[in-house]
């Protein structure tokens, strides 16, 4: 497995000290390492993957150095616009390194919403002309691939990608964070909201734990799931799904949990 500290240090030797992206479970150990070791002003958790690409572009314009952009492969679609119309060598030619978690890799067990994206991830990189490598699962070859792809990015003035398989990074113990002063956790919050809603309210819940906890609340209380739409994919788009429902059915109240 890949040592997160050695990989982080290798990025520094390549001149990469700015990080932007959208967290991914496959990259969790490395993202935690970034959070613990990069200064606050050099690490931005972006609103979406396209915004992360733009942040990396701005960093390069100001410093002349490439940045690292991390994301799940499900976010590649959000990143395509700035990749091909801003950073591409035929436009502004902005070097950057993408670290892409490979959910839904063919032949690897995963959730259904990841199957299609996993199958097309390498082909999507090919289609937009972005050089990529599958990141090796051991530290030394991973660092060698990292250095080679950064060299390509800088010499050719273009985005490049390293695609990361599941369980590539070794576990990392994140530094302890100050205890939250909030007394209501996410599970209790979801239950509190769901309990207070009238029975005619349609509910759209976002990707991840919020949808899981809404589902579990309905099951535990013996309620049906018919008025809930659990957004298992399309991270970041739950609010617009809810808006689409509300515009089409203005007589029915719609709540979005995001």
For each predicted feature, which ranges?
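Thiamine diphosphate
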Residues: 1-126, 130-253
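Glycine- and Gly-Pro-enriched alpha-helical subdomains that act as flexible
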Residues: 257-258
């Amino acid at each position: 497995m890949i040592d997160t500290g050695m990989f982080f240090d290798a990025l520094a030797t390549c001149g990469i000290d700015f990080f932007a992206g959208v967290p991914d479970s496959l990259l969790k150990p490395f993202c935690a390492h970034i959070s613990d070791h990069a200064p606050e002003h050099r690490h931005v958790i972006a609103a979406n993957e396209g915004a992360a690409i733009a942040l990396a572009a701005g960093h390069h314009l100001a410093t002349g150095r490439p940045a690292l952009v991390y994301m799940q492969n499900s976010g590649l679609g959000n990143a395509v616009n700035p990749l091909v119309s801003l950073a591409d060598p035929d436009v502004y030619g902005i070097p950057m390194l993408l670290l892409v978690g490979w959910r839904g890799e063919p032949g690897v067990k995963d959730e259904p919403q990841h199957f299609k994206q996993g199958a097309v991830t390498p082909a999507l990189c090919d289609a937009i002309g972005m050089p990529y490598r599958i990141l090796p699962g051991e530290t030394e070859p991973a660092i060698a691939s990292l250095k080679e792809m950064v060299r390509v990015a800088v010499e050719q003035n273009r985005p490049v990608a390293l695609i990361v398989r599941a369980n590539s990074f070794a576990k990392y113990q994140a530094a302890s964070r100050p205890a939250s002063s909030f007394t209501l956790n996410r599970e209790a919050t979801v239950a509190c909201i769901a309990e207070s809603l009238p029975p005619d309210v349609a509910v759209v819940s976002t990707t991840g734990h919020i949808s899981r906890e809404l589902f579990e609340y309905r099951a535990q209380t013996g309620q049906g799931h018919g008025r809930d739409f659990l957004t298992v994919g399309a991270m970041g788009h739950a609010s617009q799904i809810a808006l689409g429902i509300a515009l089409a059915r203005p007589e029915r109240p719609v709540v979005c949990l995001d």
